[in-house]
Amino acid sequence: MVLTDGAAIPAAPFFWYAAGFTFGRSGATVWAMPLPVIAHLDADAFFVSVEQACDPSLRGKKVAVGGRQRGIIASASYEARACGVYTPMATKLALQVCPDLILVSHTSGRYGQFSRRMFDLCGTLTPFVERSSIDEGYLDLSPCGCGTEAELVNRARGLQRRLWEELQIPVSLGLAANKLVAAIASKLLKPRGFVVVPPGTEAEFLAPLSVGVLPGIGKKSEAKLKAQGLTAVQDLLALNEEGWYALFGHSWRDIQAMARGEDDRPLKLEHDDAKSYSQQETFPHDVSDFAEIERIAKRMIDELMPKIRADGKKVRTMTVKVRYPGMEDSVAGRSLTEATDLEAPFYPLVELLLRRAWAKRRPLRLVSVRFSGVDDRPAQLEMFAQTEEKKRRLAAVLDKLNDRGRKAVVQHGHQLGKTTAD
């Protein structure tokens, strides 16, 4: 890999980037700037790494975790990726492109256990940890009390080494002033990468990188942009407002901010071992419009499900509660046959549960939605899993687009109607 300054990145696991310098070994230079205190941790080929930790004979081999027959590949080792295996890919096709691929069936419960142990170790470095998915998370390193970048780098690298020594899980780390840049940095030199972006150099760091590093720009969008000569992030920044709007519509300002490396999202510190997920809304005045209550309940589904996905969980049961004036509550619930982390299966239940819970049809003071029956087992990899995986990947893209502390960039149709006062 070569940046625009012509400096090649050496093939070693720990490197950092500083403005005015090429990639080099961390700790080699001191910069007189605030410290980059947000770290993004990204486990390398997590499912495969867990299986290799449990069976070291799999290390260094072309390995994939996936379902057999009509299943899909959930994770592939870097050796397998070099042969053309990717995620998600039909198992049948993966075995065609890589005949000597070692296929390992997923092990129920194992990945959640390793994930919890991984984030428990992160908690020994800092109490401020956000688990964004089963194999990724953010750390606020400001409580570490580091006075220099060398101390900060040593602490972070120490965590990286400890995760390998105690769990045999390789991870990549990105350090920056905000979550967006830290996440991009962590993926730049995988596997076992270590990249530091000093505060104030975010735009310079992103400028030569492919437009595809920005959240929300998938492979199809990236191909369309490159067909128009917009290859690197710096090409986007050269556009005027009309050009931005033509490409991205009303969300152009958010994507422009990302291209500049701007991100003010705080860490979300919810507990990741939740047994249920719930949200409620109390109205400033009593509400009797069924369609409005239904829209609010569906919006709660849309806001809760990204948290469930981020925790690597699925849920089976949805309960709707309504409250009449005078603190009188009424509830109704229904369970799916299979746990899920997608919104769509629960939408049809909203009207049914509301009609049951709201049998008296008096004006309401409050409505709440609660998900329970939490399941942290890995996704089913057989049968119709390819369709489910596509939906899950789309949901993950929407989560990243909307997780910017502003108004949602992408909304479902039921979110576009009448709104109530917050």
PLM feature spans:
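Short, hydrophobic beta-strand segments
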Residues: 137-143, 331-334, 378-384
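Acidic, metal-coordinating catalytic segment for phosphate/diphosphate chemistry
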Residues: 338-422
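Gly/Gly-Pro- and Ser/Thr-rich, intrinsically disordered tail segments characteristic of DNA damage-repair
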Residues: 14-257, 306, 388-422
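Short, charged/polar surface micro-motifs in flexible loops or helix N-caps
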Residues: 44-46, 69-72, 325-329, 374-377
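A glycine-rich phosphate-binding loop feature that marks nucleotide/adenosyl-phosphate handling sites
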Residues: 175-180, 261, 314-325, 364-375, ...
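DNA-contacting surface of Y-family translesion DNA polymerases
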Residues: 31, 213, 221-364
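Positively charged N-terminal leader segments that act as targeting/secretion signals
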Residues: 2-19
